[in-house]
């Protein structure tokens, strides 16, 4: 394969994840990534772009996002404003067409990585509305009677937090991979990527406390990898006595963001 992803210096990818990325690229299909928050779904696209030396274009999906937003926007208000004030060139509609993120990816002179982030935040029709464009790698702008065709097929990575079920027709067109939460061995590798040097005792105690919290079924919002990184950084900066880490879990608010979860863990520690 021309492009092969083998991870990057800033991203620890499992062999299964690397295979999924490479298969999606070889088959020229979007890669749909699911996993709980903090498992590195968004960072994967950054890592692929970095490893392959390609530009990254990010389309962050919101609840109000429509598929049309990713193609282009016709600024009819600006055109009307210009026409009222006699601005020259108002008849050139192309001046008022702004490409969206998908349009940018199609128009790029070199292949890019396109991240469609948190696709499930939009309404249920959003993924289906993208099927034609992602299949055919083109779209039509009726205002200018122009067809935008991809100069180079982008590497498309789509993330989902599983807030909504995605349409079957959309799923059939994707390569799917679920990122499992890292086990302790893989998590240790991830932590070492973020720190040039970390005290071994501090790391061992922090990992022990972190996975203990995650093992408590009644904790509703379990801490993620990014919160563990922040917590270890806080422990280092304050020079906390490492013997306190598993007994008290200092700065617990870095790990847990719900009062109920903090109370649950603190009750367990007092037993």
Predicted regions, residues:
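C-terminal regulatory/interaction module of P-loop NTP-utilizing enzymes
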Residues: 1-271
């Amino acid at each position: 394969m021309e492009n092969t992803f083998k991870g990057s210096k800033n991203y620890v990818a499992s062999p299964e994840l690397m295979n999924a990325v490479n298969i999606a690229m070889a088959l020229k299909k979007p890669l749909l990534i699911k996993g709980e928050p903090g498992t590195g779904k968004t960072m994967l696209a950054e890592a692929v772009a970095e490893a392959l030396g390609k530009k990254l274009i990010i389309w962050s999906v919101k609840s109000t996002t429509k598929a049309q937003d990713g193609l282009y926007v016709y600024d009819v208000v600006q055109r009307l404003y210009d026409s009222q004030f006699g601005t020259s060139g108002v008849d050139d509609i192309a001046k008022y067409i702004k490409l969206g993120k998908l349009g940018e990816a199609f128009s790029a002179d070199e292949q890019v990585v396109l991240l469609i982030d948190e696709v499930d935040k939009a309404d249920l029709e959003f993924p289906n509305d993208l099927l034609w464009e992602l299949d055919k790698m083109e779209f039509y702008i009726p205002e200018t009677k122009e067809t935008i065709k991809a100069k180079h097929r982008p590497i498309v990575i789509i993330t989902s937090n599983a807030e909504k079920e995605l349409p079957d027709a959309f799923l059939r067109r994707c390569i799917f991979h679920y990122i499992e939460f890292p086990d302790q061995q893989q998590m240790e590798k991830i932590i070492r990527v973020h720190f040039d040097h970390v005290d071994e005792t501090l790391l061992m105690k922090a990992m022990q406390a972190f996975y203990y919290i995650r093992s408590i079924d009644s904790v509703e919002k379990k801490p993620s990898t990014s919160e563990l990184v922040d917590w270890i950084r806080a422990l280092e900066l304050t020079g906390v006595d490492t013997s306190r880490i598993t007994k008290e879990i200092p700065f617990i608010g870095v790990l847990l963001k719900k009062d109920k979860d903090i109370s649950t863990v603190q009750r367990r520690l007092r037993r």
